[in-house]
């Protein structure tokens, strides 16, 4: 099975959401941005993303494993590790907006083997964050290319730098946030576990799902 090319590096994909969105995700699944808007479940008030970056992603098309070309906004964007700078940036934005990120942040772990055993799932992946400079990002749609990603960087936990503005950090940051993209939806049946930072968040989630919930304190940036 081609999914084994990926599971030798990580058994899970990871998706960041907030406590305000998790109930609808447990009901409908993780939806692409466009599909969430079409179904009327996109909550603009809880959207932490950068508007300019989202415009760039909307206008970025990627060739999928099915042969189809899709806008990033028609894809569910996941990561290979829960420790990546995009998730940390989301926590920082939540904190600035006045929300308590340790209570709001949730990471969904997605079972790769179950997901990719479904041959109807079209996908692609990148060797850097999709929001990085276009000339630096390579896209792939065959798992035979998965070893082209920098797994030493991807599988590191968070790393401190002396200078967070130089090219060394930016290169590490973009590789750390390489993405795996699935067309339209990841259904709840593929969710393996929900990760959160606080016991209160765990208690809230457990009232709404039978999926395993684990508290991991070092998911927090601060």
In which residue ranges do the predicted regions lie?
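Active-site-proximal loop/hinge segments that shape catalytic or ion-binding/gating pockets
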Residues: 1-77, 84-222
């Amino acid at each position: 099975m081609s999914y084994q090319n990926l599971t030798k590096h990580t058994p899970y994909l990871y998706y960041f959401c907030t406590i305000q969105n998790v109930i609808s995700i447990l009901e409908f699944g993780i939806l692409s941005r466009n599909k969430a808007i079409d179904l009327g479940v996109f909550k603009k008030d809880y959207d932490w993303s950068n508007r300019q970056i989202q415009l760039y992603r909307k206008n970025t098309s990627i060739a999928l494993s099915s042969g189809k070309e899709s806008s990033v906004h028609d894809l569910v964007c996941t990561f290979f590790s829960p420790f990546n700078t995009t998730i940390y940036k989301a926590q920082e934005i939540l904190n600035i907006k006045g929300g308590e990120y340790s209570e709001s942040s949730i990471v969904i772990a997605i079972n790769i083997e179950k997901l990719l055993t479904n041959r109807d799932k079209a996908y692609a992946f990148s060797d850097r964050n999709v929001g990085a400079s276009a000339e630096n990002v390579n896209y792939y749609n065959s798992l035979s290319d998965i070893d082209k990603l920098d797994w030493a960087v991807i599988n590191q936990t968070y790393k401190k730098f002396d200078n967070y503005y130089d090219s060394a950090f930016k290169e590490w940051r973009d590789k750390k946030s390489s993405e795996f993209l699935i067309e339209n939806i990841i259904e709840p049946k593929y969710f393996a576990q929900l990760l959160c930072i606080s016991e209160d968040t765990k208690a809230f989630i457990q009232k709404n799902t039978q999926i395993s919930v684990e508290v991991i304190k070092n998911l927090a940036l601060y």
